[in-house]
Swiss-Prot record:
Protein known as: [F-actin]-monooxygenase MICAL3
Location of the LIM zinc-binding domain: 762-824
Cofactor(s) needed: FAD
Biological process (GO), any one: exocytosis
Polar residues: bias regions: 1150-1163, 1268-1280, 1288-1302, 1436-1451, 1760-1769
Keyword terms, alphabetized: Actin-binding, Cell cycle, Cell division, Cell projection, Coiled coil, Cytoplasm, Cytoskeleton, Exocytosis, FAD, Flavoprotein, LIM domain, Metal-binding, Monooxygenase, NADP, Nucleus, Oxidoreductase, Phosphoprotein, Zinc
Source organism per UniProt: Homo sapiens (Human)
Length: 2002
């Protein structure tokens, strides 16, 4: 520790930290220059710079980064940096792609210079990241620079942050970066090369810049512009007018904001209802919208022009886009209002304030972009040669391929192109010939536009610059050098360019020409003659008169599908009937739209040749590859069925689109078209079919119309097949449904009844104008222009594959509005819509958003108040002139351009100012965050860094307390219950916000961990779950569907919960501690990774992360804190009260809590208030006074003056507020509150203390109550907060376990202990540096802080004590959770003196905090798992873990604010027991605290009260019956919330284990007897976890593993088990360490804290698996066992890990990993979910069966009186149920522990007794199952979220492609009409029968058919997506519902469940049918398409560049 201590004083290390933490471009460059100057390094020496820097900077924080960069640089492709040693490169633009390219080139050994014309990174816009980009950036050390990088479910990052990350990496690698240098052109080498060999140079501004002298041979354009470098021709894809609006709002990181769900892309085709509601409410008409929560709230939306005109954003309508979007034509104020309104509505008015961030001109950050034209370069590179010097010119990023933003392809494809370019430069440098280099580059580039997350290689770890590692089926030699000769420019011949281009086109698209042969009429005619040969009455001689009778058409159909037509019955004379029959069958069965009616055909003299060519071409394309039925007479029935299906099934565009680089992607290619022929039709049918199924017969009309729609067009012909199939499917689906004949004709119905008044096929049904063949569409027997085919209600353009038709009034509707057709609603609504678009629209919006008549006024007003600039800027902006570029650069209107003149005068706002305004909340915590992240840059950082950072956030008060308070209150009012509101009020809005921030941060961090473990999808869910878990206990009680309640509450409380996260403040403390711990841990962890022996921190980090996660869990608990949280608090209080009879208030609460959680929250608030006011505290904390007397560890560590100071610092008022809303307050007071928190913590401890009123330190609980903190109002205020900041709270925590405190103090408190802790936590030291300020604010002196950090580790010190004997770690958590327990553990560890002394918990604050966090998380998990139980046991736990618990449950913390109610008379022993335990066996004392926490059940006397309380709880929260369910929810949240929590779910159980600590456990273990006497009071708890129970748990886990179908899930579970075991082992090892200091203690500890033993058990070889599985699988069981206290897999492992990491870096890291692995089980869960998604039914079965089992088990548990409080109480009943098993398990674990840690039998006995004490909290099989179920549910939720995001992105892609198709069709129609007019002589030139024109006509017809098929494929894909999405949502809902036992549901609920199941089965059927068709087609195409590469190429080049 000493080394690290001094390390931080090393100026180089300080400078490095400053560099890593820099938040601006200039700041980064300056910090780096200072670092280089100090180290005397010169970046100019690029070859050795990095190695010199590495050798000179021997800093543990930097080593983690070196390890990552060394790993990347060691790849074989880089040839150790010698691949490009003499290559000089210039890169234009320091954007993400330019910098990414520079990094790879530098690793190749090239000299790289980057020039950037600005010196600020000001783009707040957020980029979506594909999984491989996240992996890639992590490999470059992104987490080292930006701790929050892709935390949790987050898969996006702001451009600014991404640039900063890459800039820092580039600088470290020795890349020269010059800012304020603008590239203006290339300077060719002079002709006179004899005198001076000068090569290519750049013309830059300023001209005198040294870069102007730089000669290079490679130049790469990465500035995003279209014309920077010459020679690149562009392909343009013009889609529908697409106007994108981006807006950035300030993110204050409040809880309210944290709970708003992101919108990862809502595409209109995917969720039409949302957009229609938006339009009706606000008049805003969007095509899609995306919302990402990053440094800012980032929105990007595509607005429809008409909507912008209606809302006054665009003043005048111009056809020219440049004029349309010119600055003069845009009302900036209206634009701001539009963006704000859309953002407000899309987030359901949940964002408290929408204040615009500012751009780099100080204007509101809103911009409009024209996405109508997307450009892609035709080639990626070229070579120029002048005067003997060759120059390789390349493009990357947007300059190469412009992305369509909503699809998130920009960075992904940009990075792929960057790596491809690096590979090209490598080949160039290795001497490959220029043409070969170019040919390879272009071969690779053709695949780039087609890449999707699904069709790139999935093995991200193998990615390198070699394209083969990234593109699955790439042929790098696809193009030959001769085909790219035109890209070699010698400046001599310009003609070669054109020649070569034509050559390339002819060579590269061999298949495009294949269809041209069809263009010849003779070929088509010949085919028709062959098909009709032999049919009576049919003689085809031409393409007109031969077809008039209709027999020829019927003959072709009969030839291939004799089942459809009885040819022999046809009458040659009945022309109309024959033709109509053929048209109808072709449309219905084959998907070929008619071009006229039978009546028309009969009436015309000669059928129109052009029309017939178009119509017959579709038959040709459909059947050309099929065998006629006559050739299939020898086929069996099966084969025939397949054949028929082949003409029906939709093309499998789906598979091509998503799975492989699409061969069919580009409908343009003719070959493609050929290939698609058959499939296209099918697709169409499918798409319609998809829709049809949706309608069902009742909606059939809609379907019919839909089907009709399918008759896409003449071209659609084939589609109709699909439609037909759809119809068939529909019919199948609807057979059971009542047929509804609303007048809407089924698609299948023949449309013989053509209206007589129709003008025929050449007159538009809608506009009555002429319809030319090429532009003709037909549906329902009507013909019309494509542009006229609109919804009667909303005027949206319809597609043939998706419409509804009302036969009665002959009107067409989009499906969503079909229901309005009869109601007159349409008439009413339509007009309304128009007004809506005006101010009226604003009105409704305002209502929704609580705005004034000025739809935006209120929001604007408030936002303006907050950001005065926004309004003003907005006004100014309208005048801003748009910047027009001479070249067609993308038209973008950025607000800063006030006018052309003003623009010049406009001054750029410094980046710092911009950041300060936009990121105030982030930056406040940012510095610390950054520090934390930088200091723990190790993997831990990666895994848990976010957590640290997030906590830091809370310290900053973003908006000012009053504003924040207002916001908080507003949020609370909006989404919280009254209780929640009260809580929030008591907390104080400011604090709330901070807490919210913290919570958000913490959640993110938690998520980060989760994500790292489970990947991004789950994190989001985690958050929700956390919030949900935080759901009001009351609600939980009341709501049978705990999960739903949780979700609802989660949402409602989110603000409160977040605020409870205010615990966030504690989190902050935790964060600080975590930072201390975690950063060091991270750092250490990384070091460990690097092999640094001092990497203890790494594990700590993990632990911290876990702790953080628990914090998150706590947060979850807290989240509910306002409502649920408070309820929880009350519940806990009630439990505490039961524990502490002394506190009548609490006792009252106990029952009242159970009965009226609402009141509880209020009381909680009061409690918090007491915390606020010492006087209140006094009475409420009477027991606390004892603790106070004892002095919270903090006080002990820090003189009282300090504490008071801290309290004042804590902003006693704020703290009071915080106390009011414990959770919220905490965040606000975080730093200060933390210190006060420690007193507060004691307060929470007081419940324990109350429980054990005895003044002895042991009754930490009681003592803590009396603890100084209790006296100190500030601390009281901070209790909640400090809880979140367990480190600080840790002190109180220590007091809680006074003995522990003493021990800790001895350990931590004593200088030696502190030093030891410090050594263990160099990271802590670093953290200190980072959190020194926080600590100071907390009131801790830096020294104290350092102690704290040590103690932080001590918390881990606590843990250290725990760590030494791993049980201690648990015990610390137990301490955290059950302070007494931890204390006793320390005693066991041999910290007997801590018993009396208040532990130096304050010192271990951070660690303690962490522990607390872990404990809290455990508790939270407990609370989540036990729900009320948590609260009940929580009281003691609160006392003990008030810090951690407080953190974890702000609500729970409420008791801390007010001393927890005295334990019930029986329970009081909890504290006493703790004392006893501590006294008898030090560890023993500690365990009792846990029992205190969980003691209720454990304490026999208290147990009945607890059970009663729990019962009341259960009664109040009906869930108690499923306390497990509650646990589930909590667990889910917890797990989701934090990885720790996940394991902590079992921790939740820990408290329970504490019960098991009771003699029963000991007895079971056989050691109990010894401990029994000591722990006899806890004996009741004994049954908690027995060895048997553990075995059961393990077996259960294994069984689950077997039942789990997903291999990934199974693996994850196995990993978790092993991890748990490892962790336990690790904890065992750490314990031994502690044991070394206190061998007996270590041993004692293990017995002492069954939880620990459980952990140990897990650790133990014997119990490892069991414990692990138990912990993982059935945390309850684990909990019951030693896990109960800490064993819970996550909790225990997390804590043990932390401790171990404190003491043994390596192990910590491993443990960390195991933890991660442990998490993986959840991940496996996710995998399971994925599998489930694949096989919905089986998945549901597996998941649901799990649930059911769990539920049943839960029910059984519930049956036990205690069960209701399944958390802590899970009670004696359950514990009793599994006492023997648990005892056995515990014995085993203890045995293993003893084996592991040389625990003496006494120790083991002590442990068993402790275990037994905890054991009462032991989990029964059901509980374990319930926990596992919860885990699976969580994983499932995360998986579902991930899948949902994927679907959304796919939907966006489809939407974009449909737009492109529409635009292409429009252009084709224009050309087709012109050709048709010429052919018909209508062009004024007379009738021309020009063969060239006819040839052109054939080509156009084919193209149109291809487009129609392509569109139908897209629609099928969209339909499949829709069904998939629906199924997923139903599945999730069903899963949530089935998590509740049937007997708890009402009839209505059961019937709803049945309905959902039925609907889901229907959807599954539809999907199965659809997928079967698609798969069939896919197989056929594989047969047909042998030349995949060629097809890809054709598609690639004609591909739409989205």
């Amino acid at each position: 520790m000493e080394e690290r201590k001094h390390e931080t004083m090393n100026p180089a290390h300080v400078l490095f930290d400053r560099f890593v933490q820099a938040t601006t471009c200039k700041g980064t460059l300056k910090a780096f220059q200072e670092l280089c100057d100090h180290l005397e390094l010169k970046p100019k020496d690029y070859r050795s710079f990095y190695h010199k820097l590495k050798s000179k900077l021997n800093y543990w924080k930097a080593k983690a980064l070196w390890a990552k960069l060394d790993k990347r640089g060691s790849h074989k492709d880089y040839k150790k940096g010698k691949a490009c040693t003499n290559t000089k490169c210039l890169i234009i633009g320091a954007g993400p792609c330019g910098l990414r390219t520079a990094i790879d080139l530098s690793l190749l050994g090239a000299k790289v210079v980057v020039i950037e014309k600005r010196d600020a990174f000001s783009r707040n816009n957020v980029l979506h990241l594909w999984p491989f980009t996240i992996h890639d950036l992590r490999g470059l050390g992104a987490k080292k620079f930006y701790g929050k990088f892709c935390a949790g479910a987050i898969d996006h990052i702001s451009i600014r942050q991404l640039q900063l990350i890459l800039l820092k990496v580039a600088l470290i690698l020795g890349i020269e970066i010059h800012v304020n240098v603008e590239f203006q052109g290339l300077i060719q080498p002079p002709e006179d090369q004899e005198n001076e060999r000068i090569g290519w140079r750049a013309l830059v501004h300023p001209k005198t810049h040294p870069v102007s002298e730089y000669e290079f041979e490679v130049i790469i354009g990465g500035d995003g512009r279209r014309n920077t470098l010459e020679g690149f021709r562009r392909k343009e894809f013009r889609g529908k007018l697409a106007i994108a609006i981006t807006a950035n709002f300030i993110n204050r990181n409040t809880t309210a904001e944290a709970k708003v769900e992101e919108i990862s892309g809502v595409a209109f085709i995917f969720n039409q209802k949302f957009f229609q509601e938006l339009r009706e409410a606000t008049g805003i008409d969007l095509e899609n919208i995306v919302y990402y929560k990053d440094d800012t709230h980032y929105f990007v939306m595509t607005a429809k022009k008409q909507s912008l005109l209606d809302k006054g954003v665009i003043l005048h309508d111009y056809a020219d886009t440049e004029l349309l979007l010119s600055r003069e034509n845009v009302d900036q104020e209206a634009l701001l209002s539009y963006a704000r309104e859309a953002a407000d509505f899309s987030t359901q008015q949940q964002l408290p304030s929408l204040d615009f961030a500012i751009n780099h001109y100080g204007q509101p950050d809103v911009a409009m972009f024209d996405f109508t034209c997307m450009y892609a370069s035709e080639n990626a590179a070229l070579v120029r040669e002048q005067n003997g010097h060759q120059l390789l010119v390349a493009l990357v990023g947007d300059s190469l391929l412009e992305p369509f933003w909503p699809m998130g392809t920009g960075i992904a494809r940009g990075f792929l192109a960057a790596m491809d370019s690096a590979w090209m430069v490598r080949s160039w440098s290795l001497g490959t010939s220029p043409l070969e280099v170019l040919a390879e580059r272009e071969s690779i580039y053709r695949l780039l536009p087609q890449t999707t997350p699904e069709n790139v290689s999935k093995n991200f770890s193998q990615y390198s610059i070699d394209p083969v590692t990234r593109y699955p089926n790439i042929n790098v030699n696809f193009l030959r050098p001769s085909q790219v000769r035109h890209l070699y420019d010698t400046g001599e011949t310009k003609d070669i360019h054109l020649e070569m281009e034509s050559l390339v086109n002819s060579r590269t698209t061999p298949k495009l020409t294949r269809n041209e042969s069809v263009a010849r009429s003779s070929k088509l005619l010949g085919w028709c003659q062959r098909q009709t040969d032999g049919y009576a009455g049919v003689n085809v001689t031409d393409l007109t008169m031969s077809w008039k009778s209709g027999l020829a058409l019927c003959a072709i159909i009969h030839r291939y599908r004799p089942d459809l037509i009885d040819f022999d019955s046809l009458d040659e004379q009945n022309v109309e009937k024959n033709n109509q029959l053929a048209f109808d069958i072709a449309e219905k069965e084959l998907g070929i739209s008619p071009i006229m009616t039978g009546k028309e055909m009969a009436s015309v003299g000669e059928p129109d040749k052009l029309s017939m060519v178009m119509y017959l071409t579709q038959f040709y394309e459909m059947f050309k590859d099929s065998l006629p039925s006559s050739d299939t007479l020898d086929l069996n029935a099966e084969e025939k069925a397949v054949l028929i299906a082949s003409t029906r099934s939709p093309i499998s565009f789906l598979s091509k689109l998503g799975q492989t680089i699409s061969r069919k992607r580009s409908p343009k290619d003719k070959k493609e078209k050929d290939l698609d022929g058959a499939g296209k039709r099918r697709k169409t049918s499918q798409s319609e079919e998809e829709e049809a199924p949706r309608g069902h017969r009742g909606e059939r009309p809609t379907l019919v119309s839909t089907l009709t729609d399918r008759r896409m067009d003449v071209a659609v012909g084939n589609q109709n097949k699909v439609k037909y199939m759809a119809t068939q499917l529909l019919a199948k689906f609807e057979e059971n449904a009542p047929a509804q004949s609303i007048g809407i004709r089924r698609q299948g119905s023949m449309k013989k009844e053509f209206p007589q008044n129709l003008g025929g096929s050449d007159t538009c049904y809608f506009c009555q104008k002429r319809v030319y063949v090429m532009e003709r569409l037909s549906a329902e027997g009507k013909f019309f222009h494509r542009s006229c085919f609109k919804c009667e209600y909303c005027a949206t353009t319809l597609r043939l594959s998706a419409y509804a038709y009302d036969i009665e009034d002959g009107k067409f509707y989009c499906k969503p509005h079909y229901c309005y057709r009869l109601s007159g609603y349409a008439q009413r609504k339509r007009p309304a819509v128009a007004p809506l678009s005006g101010k009226e629209a604003k009105g409704p919006l305002q209502d929704g958003a609580t705005t004034d008549a000025n739809g935006r006024a209120n929001a604007v007003a408030s936002s303006t108040e907050r950001t005065p600039g926004s309004g003003v800027n907005g006004l100014e902006e309208p005048s801003i002139a748009k910047r027009l570029r001479g070249t067609p650069e993308r038209i973008e209107l950025e607000n800063y351009r006030l006018s052309l003149r003003q623009a010049e005068a406009l001054q750029e706002v410094p980046e710092e100012t911009q950041a300060e305004h936009n990121l105030s909340s982030v930056l406040d915590t940012g510095a610390e965050e950054d520090v934390a992240s930088s200091s723990s840059e190790s993997e831990m950082e990666e895994e848990g860094e976010e957590e640290e950072e997030e906590p830091r956030l809370p310290p900053s008060d973003l908006g000012g307390v009053p504003w924040k308070e207002a916001v908080r209150i507003h949020a609370l009012l909006k989404g919280k219950s009254e209780e929640e509101l009260e809580a929030s009020k008591s907390f104080g809005p400011g604090n709330e916000e901070e807490e919210e921030e913290e919570e958000e941060y913490e959640e993110e961090e938690e998520e980060d961990y989760d994500e790292e473990e489970e990947e991004s999808s789950e994190a989001g869910n985690q958050r929700l779950q956390q919030v949900m878990h935080a759901a009001d206990p009351l609600e939980i009680q009341a709501d049978v569907h705990w999960t739903h309640i949780r979700e609802r509450e989660e949402e409602e409380r989110m603000a409160p919960a977040s605020e409870s996260s205010a615990s966030g403040a504690p989190l902050d403390e935790n964060d600080l501690e975590e930072d201390v711990d975690s950063e060091p841990a991270e750092i250490e962890g990384e070091a460990a990774e690097d092999g640094d022996p001092g990497d203890t921190g790494a594990e700590l980090d993990d632990d911290q992360h876990w702790s953080d996660s628990p914090s998150d869990a706590d947060r979850e608990l807290r989240l509910p804190c306002p409502a649920e949280g408070e309820a929880e608090l009350e519940l806990r209080v009630s439990e505490d009260e039961e524990k502490l009879p002394a506190s009548p208030k609490h006792q009252e609460r106990g029952p009242s809590q159970a009965t009226s959680p609402i009141r509880s929250p209020q009381e909680s608030a009061l409690l918090f208030i007491p915390v606020h006011s010492p006087s209140t505290e006094g009475p409420q904390l009477p027991p606390v006074p004892a603790a106070t007397q004892e002095k919270s560890p903090e006080e002990r560590l820090f003189p009282e003056p300090l504490l008071p100071k801290e309290k004042p610092k804590a902003d006693a008022p704020s703290d009071l507020k915080a106390v009011h809303s414990p959770i919220r307050s905490q965040p606000v007071t975080l730093p200060e509150a933390r210190t006060p928190v420690s007193p507060g913590s004691p307060q929470p401890q007081p419940p324990v203390a109350a429980s054990t009123p005895p003044p002895s330190p042991l009754p930490i609980c009681s003592q803590p109550q009396p603890s100084t903190e209790a006296t100190v109002p500030s601390p009281t205020q901070s209790p909640i907060r400090f809880q979140p900041a367990p480190a600080k709270t840790s002190t109180p925590l220590a007091p809680l376990p006074v003995q522990s405190q003493s021990d800790t103090k001895d350990r931590l408190g004593s200088p030696l202990a502190v030093d030891e802790a410090l050594r263990r936590s160099d990271l802590v030291e670093e953290f200190w540096m980072k959190s020194a300020e926080i600590r100071r604010s907390l009131g801790l002196t830096p020294v104290d802080r350092s102690k704290g950090p040590e103690p932080s580790f001590p918390t881990p010190a606590f843990r250290p004590v725990s760590l030494k004997s791993y049980s201690v770690e648990k015990s610390p958590q137990d301490e955290g959770l059950h302070l007494l327990k931890p204390l006793s553990i320390p005693k066991r560890l041999g910290l007997p003196k801590p018993e009396g002394e208040p532990l130096s918990l304050p010192t271990p604050r951070s660690p303690s905090d962490r522990e607390l966090r872990s404990a809290q998380e455990e508790r939270r998990e407990l609370s989540s798992s036990s729900g009320l139980g948590l609260h009940g046991s929580s009281s003691n736990m609160k006392t003990l873990g008030s810090q951690s618990f407080n953190t974890s449950d702000s609500a729970m913390l409420t008791p801390p604010s007010s001393p927890p109610p005295p334990p019930p008379p029986g329970e009081e022993p909890a504290t006493l027991r703790r004392k006893l335990r501590e006294a008898e066996p030090n560890a023993s004392v500690v365990p009792p605290p846990l029992p205190a926490t969980w003691m209720r059940p454990p304490r026999e006397p208290a147990q009945p009260p607890r059970e009663e309380v729990r019962k009341s709880f259960v009664e109040s929260v009906e869930e108690i019956p499923f306390a497990d369910d509650v646990e589930d929810t909590y667990d889910d949240k917890t797990e989701d919330s934090s990885l720790q929590e996940k394991f902590f779910t079992p921790p939740s159980c820990w408290p329970r284990p504490e019960k098991p600590r009771h003699p029963p456990l000991a007895k079971e273990n056989g050691r109990l007897p010894a401990l029994e006497g000591t722990l006899q009071p806890q004996k009741r708890g004994l049954p908690l976890v027995s060895a048997e129970a553990k075995e059961l748990a393990e077996e259960r886990m294994r069984a689950r593993e077997k039942s789990v179908k997903s291999q990934a899930l199974r693996d994850a579970m196995a990993r978790q088990l092993s991890r748990m075991q490892q962790m336990e082992l690790a904890s065992g090892a750490p314990r031994p360490r502690k044991a070394s200091s206190a061998p007996s203690q270590g041993k004692e500890r293990r017995p002492d804290s069954p939880t620990r033993p459980t952990l140990r058990g897990s650790e133990e070889p014997t119990l490892k698996h069991e414990a692990t599985s138990e912990e993982v699988l059935s945390p309850p069981s684990d909990s019951g066992g030693p896990d109960g206290s800490f064993t819970s897999s996550e909790g225990s492992s997390g804590k043990s890990k932390k401790r171990s990491s404190l003491f043994s870096p390596r192990r910590n890291k491993k443990e960390k990993k195991s933890k991660g692995e442990g998490r993986p089980p959840e991940k496996p869960s996710s995998n399971l979910l994925e599998e489930a998604a694949a096989k919905p039914k089986s998945l549901w079965k597996s998941v649901f069966s799990g649930y059911k089992k769990d539920k049943k088990k839960k029910a059984d548990d519930k049956s036990c009186p205690s069960t209701p409080s399944s958390g802590a109480t899970v009670d004696s009943g359950k514990h009793r149920v599994l006492p023997v098993v648990r005892a056995e398990l515990q014995l085993r674990r203890q045995l293993s522990f003893s084996e592991d840690s040389d625990l003496s039998s006494d120790d083991v006995l002590e442990k068993s007794s402790q275990k037994s004490r905890r054991e009462p909290r032991t989990y029964t099989e059901e509980e374990l199952n319930a926990k596992l179920t919860r885990r699976v549910q969580k994983a499932a939720r995360r998986q579902a979220k991930q899948e949902e995001l994927k679907r959304l992105h796919r939907a966006q892609i489809i939407q974009r492609q449909l737009q492109q198709v529409e635009e292409r069709q429009r252009r084709l129609e224009e050309r087709g009409v012109a050709v048709e007019k010429a052919l018909r002589g209508e062009a004024g030139m007379g009738k021309k029968d020009d063969p060239k024109l006819m040839q052109e006509w054939f080509k156009l017809v084919q193209e149109k058919n291809a487009m129609v098929r392509y569109e139908s494929e897209l629609m099928i894909f969209a339909r499949e997506l829709e069904l998939e999405d629906r199924q997923s949502r139903l599945q999730q809902e069903l899963r949530e519902r089935m998590a509740v036992e049937d007997h708890l549901k009402t009839e209505e609920e059961l019937s709803e469940e049945k309905q959902i199941l039925n609907e889901m089965l229907e959807v599954v059927e539809q999907r199965d049918s659809l997928v079967a068709l698609l798969e069939e087609q896919r197989l056929r195409e594989r047969e047909e398409d042998k030349d995949l590469e060629a097809a890809m190429l054709s598609k690639g080049f004609s591909l739409n560049w989205s």
